[in-house]
Amino acid sequence: VGRLYVRKFNYSYARSGTLFEGRFKTCVVQEDQYLLACLRYIELNPVRAGMVSDPGDYRWSSYRAHAFGVKAQLWSPQRLYLELADSCRRRQQTWRAMTAEAVNGELLAKIRHCSNTGLVLGTEAFREQVQRLRN
């Protein structure tokens, strides 16, 4: 991102430094439980980092859209999120309950490892399928 934009952004939000820390990290994620776990992981990151005590307090999170239906310009719900319940209210309640539970420690470690290394996050069969497509 251009230096002028970063300077303007920092001035606008009374901050300093680079806009993004480190390299952008990405990995292929299988839907099913892995995608929802990643969404929970991402939305709870500001809480784990001690930036906020409630995920809804973090301005840049999609948590308020998922948990309370707050409209967000750059947000569109994932199919799996929509399948959590048949009504908006129940989906939001389900999401709040899901995010109130900690992400399983083993799964949390897998998410971190795959996102840091660019490995595929999913079942063995899914990882093999992605590997075949990449070759």
Q: Where are the regions that the model predicts?
A:
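Short Pro-Cys-Gly-centered "Cys-loop" motif that presents a nucleophilic cysteine in a tight turn
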Residues: G2-N135
